[in-house]
């Protein structure tokens, strides 16, 4: 089985439940782990992960992908208009036809899959509306 895992946190970051789930699934299935997109603006203002895309396979067998965030805007801006996710929607569209299941671990990813008719697992890690201090991000989470 081929699984597209739209993750809430980067695979190579602090090890948490999403990475362990992906590693466990990779023991018997092909797993494509899509890291959250880093926009050029977020990278410029806060640093951290580079916004340019990359791909690689980890020792556990998980294929990790970082989508190119060069033309993406910060995630919180999607609370104003959902069209900001368009570059990501185009990027993941190529995988949607070849996977058996899409595993979603972050509410805004779901917004990118409105027209996907295949099997989905929606894994809500936390109630992010209570964790986020950004009003636009809370608005986006509530909307999705």
Question: Language-model segments: which ranges?
Answer:
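Short, basic, glycine/proline-bearing loop/turn elements
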Residues: 2-8, 75-78, 122-131
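Flexible, charged surface loops at secondary-structure boundaries
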Residues: 26-27, 58, 94-100, 114-115
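A conserved catalytic-core segment of Leloir-type glycosyltransferases
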Residues: 39-97
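N-terminal subdomain of nucleotide-sugar transferases
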Residues: 1-50
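An aromatic- and histidine-rich active-site surface loop
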Residues: 84-89, 101-116
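Membrane-proximal helix-turn-helix segments that form the acceptor-binding/catalytic region
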Residues: 87-94, 115, 127-144
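Short, charged/polar "capping" segments at the starts of alpha-helices
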Residues: 39-44, 109-112, 132
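Active-site proximal beta-strand in glycosyltransferases
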Residues: 103, 113-130
């Amino acid at each position: 089985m081929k699984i597209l895992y739209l993750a809430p946190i980067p695979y190579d970051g602090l090890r948490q439940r999403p990475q362990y789930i992906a590693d466990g699934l990779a023991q018997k299935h092909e797993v494509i782990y899509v890291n959250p997109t880093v926009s050029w603006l977020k990278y410029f203002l806060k640093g951290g992960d580079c916004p340019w895309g990359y791909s690689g396979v980890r020792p556990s067998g998980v294929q990790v992908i970082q989508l190119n965030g060069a033309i993406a805007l910060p995630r919180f801006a999607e609370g104003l208009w959902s069209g900001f996710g368009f570059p990501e929607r185009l990027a993941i569209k190529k995988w949607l036809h070849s996977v058996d299941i899409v595993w979603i671990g972050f509410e805004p990813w779901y917004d990118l899959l409105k027209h996907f008719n295949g099997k989905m697992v929606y894994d809500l890690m936390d109630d992010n509306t209570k964790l986020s201090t950004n009003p636009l991000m809370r608005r986006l989470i509530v909307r999705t």
